[in-house]
Amino acid sequence: MKKIDSWLTKHGLKNRLTLVVIVIFIIFLILLFMFVNLSDEDTGQITITENAELRTGPNAAYPVIYKIEKGESFKKIDRKGKWIEVQNHAGTEKGWVAGWHTNLNIPADQSLSSNPLKGKTIVLDPGHGGSDQGASSSTPSKSLEKNYTLKTAKELKKLLNKEGAHVKMTRSNDKYVSLDDRNIKGDAFISIHNDALDSSNANGVTVYWFKDKQESLAQTLNSAIQKKALLTNRGSRQQNYQVLRQTDIPAVLLELGYISNPTDESMINDQLHRQVVEQAIVDGLKQYFSS
């Protein structure tokens, strides 16, 4: 061993060899660190770094399963783009969370910082009108559906315009418009109605869709309305309505409360409550177009 050491010293290689060993060791440590981090990101545990939402799919248009809080941890299952599929440690719940809410150092989508409705064309369809009065209440106020769908659409139009959206109305006054003539092109179509039944017990909001391409918009708007509105949430449902069937764009039909229910009717008549629902619709559209 002494002979080897003497030979290395004689030829000036001892210091070089030491340097090479140190360099190799440093490279090894770097590779080990990268491997550990990669393994943790690909198959390990992730931590939520700020309050977020667990969703049924990998973008903001999917419905929320439940809210998750900063500090919670999950098992990572998969990744699509900037969205991470996770499972709770009990193995009872799976869903998707935006990667920028986790410790994986994924940058947020740039679209989230801009206005997602700017330049979008939203078609608002106030149900009924003119000789077609729609549903009516049995209370002394005798509320007519056609009047409140138009009020809601006009108020909603103002909110959407403030967000930079271009709004088309199938009617802007009390006139009859056929279902065929309500087929107007845009980026999204929203038909506004109030429900009614012979029984005064039925109540709440229902969001209808028909074609598969319409379901995501329906679920997003339903989730947004559920967060803010005081009305009972009846969910999103598939229904073969002509205004949904005849269009090729994302479209929904909103039944914003039962005019035949006294409690719902009072909220439909209340401008402040309508504004809450209208803002929820705007929020849902922003969320839908951000995905």
From Swiss-Prot:
Upper lineage: Bacteria, Bacillati, Bacillota, Bacilli, Bacillales
Protein name: Probable cell wall amidase LytH
A single GO BP: cell wall organization
PANTHER family: CELL WALL AMIDASE LYTH-RELATED (PTHR30404:SF7), N-ACETYLMURAMOYL-L-ALANINE AMIDASE (PTHR30404)
Ranges of residues in domain SH3b: 41-105
Compartments it resides in: Secreted
Family of the protein in this entry: Belongs to the N-acetylmuramoyl-L-alanine amidase 3 family.
Polar residues bias: start-end ranges: 133-142
Primary subcellular site in the record, as a coarse category: secreted
EC identifiers of the protein: 3.5.1.-
Molecular function GO terms recorded: N-acetylmuramoyl-L-alanine amidase activity
Role this protein plays: Probably involved in cell-wall metabolism.
